[in-house]
């Protein structure tokens, strides 16, 4: 009895409040895959040379640079999802439905961070690995 109570408390601690955590996971959709990418200075400009001002647009350009233009940073990893143009077009909507802290968004827009992107069926989460 004592160990099962401890286990429940431990699970609630790591997961927030049990049912809330399950709901959040369901809201994201099923997990697809993850990748890491360095968002370098060239990822902050579109193919017309115009400056990008949103985190989603910068991440999308990183994937276009990777797959379309062959412009890859040493830390960039492949993913199967955003290799397709039509899926890259969904990136902004997916980030709106997903998660990224204001600190992560600021680091992307104002710097050249190394990020991790977790891709789900309907959303994505972006975390900062290093600035």
Task: Enumerate the language-model features and the residues they cover.
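Charged, low-complexity intrinsically disordered segments
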Residues: 26-63, 113, 123
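Short, exposed beta-strand-loop hairpins at the edges of beta-sheets
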Residues: 106-130
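Bacterial N-terminal signal peptides that target proteins for export
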Residues: 1-9
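Mature extracytoplasmic domains of secretory-pathway proteins
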Residues: 49-104
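Short, solvent-exposed secondary-structure boundary motifs
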Residues: 26-27, 97-111
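Bacterial N-terminal signal peptides
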Residues: 8-17
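Solvent-exposed, flexible loop/coil residues
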Residues: 5, 43, 86
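Sec/Tat signal peptide C-region and signal peptidase I cleavage site
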Residues: 18-27
């Amino acid at each position: 009895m004592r160990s099962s109570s401890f286990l429940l408390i431990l699970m609630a601690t790591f997961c927030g409040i049990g049912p809330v955590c399950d709901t959040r996971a369901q809201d994201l959709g099923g997990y697809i895959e993850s990748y890491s990418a360095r968002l370098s200075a060239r990822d902050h400009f579109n193919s017309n040379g115009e400056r990008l001002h949103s985190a989603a647009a910068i991440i999308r350009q990183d994937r276009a640079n990777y797959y379309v233009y062959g412009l890859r940073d040493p830390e960039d990893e492949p993913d199967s999802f955003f290799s397709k143009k039509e899926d890259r077009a969904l990136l902004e909507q997916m980030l709106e439905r997903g998660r990224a802290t204001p600190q992560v968004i600021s680091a992307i827009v104002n710097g050249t961070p190394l990020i991790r992107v977790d891709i789900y069926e309907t959303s994505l989460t972006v975390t900062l690995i290093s600035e």
